[in-house]
Amino acid sequence: MEEKRKKIRVLVGGVFDILHVGHIHFLKQAKELGDELVVIVAHDETVRMQKRREPINPAEDRAELLRAIRYVDEVYIGTPGTIDMELVKRIDPDVIAIGPDQFFNCEKLKEELRKHGINAEVIRIPYLYKSDRAKTSKIIQRIVETFCE
């Protein structure tokens, strides 16, 4: 009898406001680290705190867009503020993938996870390419310059 292998769960988090090619490349690279990709979308309040602006799209819409991407298996909306360790525990990831532009110190995050009994590996995904086409703030800037003269 063949032993069933445990599926490797990869967790990512982010704002994912105005989806662009950089997001898709990040999600694809993260999915390649395991079998299932779970995404936690930043709560609108978290976006306001981190970005100091309103989200362009509400969290529910951002979550729905992410659910439509073939690399993504599950999507949750985070709680306002900081990382919801209880949600991370319920997801039970084997790997947490950090985006190239996310301001997390991987070692400190690993320590914080361990304090909560979460033993996931933390991996930073490198830039596939760095381009203004793959940066939400630059996309917003181009829209403003093009349509708000």
Swiss-Prot record:
Metabolic or biological pathway: Cofactor biosynthesis; FAD biosynthesis; FAD from FMN: step 1/1
Cofactor annotation: a divalent metal cation
GO biological process terms, semicolon-separated: FAD biosynthetic process; FMN metabolic process
Pfam families referenced in this protein's UniProt entry, alphabetically: CTP_transf_like
UniProt binding sites for ATP: V15, F16, H20, V21, G22, H23, D101
Key word Phosphoprotein present: no
Catalytic reaction(s) noted: FMN + ATP + H(+) = FAD + diphosphate
EC identifiers of the protein: 2.7.7.2
Molecular function, one GO term: FMN adenylyltransferase activity
Keyword tags: ATP-binding, FAD, Flavoprotein, FMN, Nucleotide-binding, Nucleotidyltransferase, Transferase
Root EC class: transferase
Matches recorded under Gene3D superfamilies: HUPs
Assembly and binders: Homodimer.
Annotated family: Belongs to the archaeal FAD synthase family.
Primary role: Catalyzes the transfer of the AMP portion of ATP to flavin mononucleotide (FMN) to produce flavin adenine dinucleotide (FAD) coenzyme.
Name of the protein in question: FAD synthase
Organism name: Thermococcus kodakarensis (strain ATCC BAA-918 / JCM 12380 / KOD1) (Pyrococcus kodakaraensis (strain KOD1))
